Amino acid sequence: GTKRGYLFRTEAELAQQEKIWKTKATFWSEDEMADYFRQNNVRTILDLSFTKFLPIEEIRAHHDYAFKFQRKHPDVVFGHWLQFDPRRALEAIREFDRALAAGAGFVGLCVNGQVLGIPPSDPCWDPLYQLAIEAGRPIMILTGLTGIGQGLPGGKGIVLDHGHPRHIDAVAARFPNLRILAARPAYPWQDDMLAVLAHKPNVHYELHGWGPRQYSPALKKAIAGRLADRVMFGCDFPVLRYEKVMADWNAEDYSREVLEKVLYRNAEAYFAADQGGNR
């Protein structure tokens, strides 16, 4: 990734990347990163996760930087997931409205309850869920084990249960018109996540952060069966590289039809109505 947009901002955080993900940080220029996506036949949605703790003026500046990158390279960057602190909901609503009007591809909201210390089912998130419904955009909710804080004292204060699929289930029940994209394979609660997906048709599944070799047998079976039209590929760039994750997918015993659905067809269908622009 680029140095300005990189998830990890300190030397200690960069050291954690090497320890947990077994990869080293490499900083590229914007054009180099876009060329890397092209070389790997990628059209991506990037996640600006670190900005949620910043003052709103700095958040806007980072968003404008990201939007400029998307406008220059729309062939490889479909858009961005934006993260906000729900305790600053008015700021978030105003900035999301500005982002929708920016003409920089897709923009959607991402919820990371673990890092913020607020589970996704907490009512303080409700204004952002309502905002996503009104804007006609999906919302991505992270679930399962996070590498953030892993191995640090107290896990850096992160409560893993804030990423349990039960919170996605509660949100999906409370907001049946909200399009929810559960993100990460939900380890160690993969069966719980599969139950939510079976019960709540407004929930789909994106699998970044883990290669398919590490999925549970039940999840692997569901990908080729009842979830074949509702699950989609995710990488976790830059801590994971596309060439490695793609090789792992191609090594699995999936039919070409299933692989095409997971790798791009399901995402094309899911985001067909989210081609950018105003509400």
Regions found by a protein language model. Give the residues of each.
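Mid-to-C-terminal alpha-helical segments outside catalytic/metal-binding sites
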Residues: 1-44, 227-232, 240-279
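Alpha-helical scaffolding within the catalytic cores
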Residues: 27-34, 63-67, 94-96, 165-168, ...
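A structural motif corresponding to the C-terminal end of an alpha-helix
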Residues: 36-45, 71-77, 135, 170-179
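Conserved, mostly hydrophobic/aromatic
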Residues: 37, 66, 99, 132, ...
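N-terminal cationic-hydrophobic initiation segments that often serve targeting/anchoring roles
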Residues: 37, 70, 74, 100, ...
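Active-site gating/metal-coordination segments in enzymes
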Residues: 43, 52-149
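Catalytic pocket-lining loop regions of alpha/beta-barrel enzymes
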Residues: 106-108, 117-232
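Charged, low-complexity C-terminal accessory regions
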Residues: 110-115, 234-237, 244
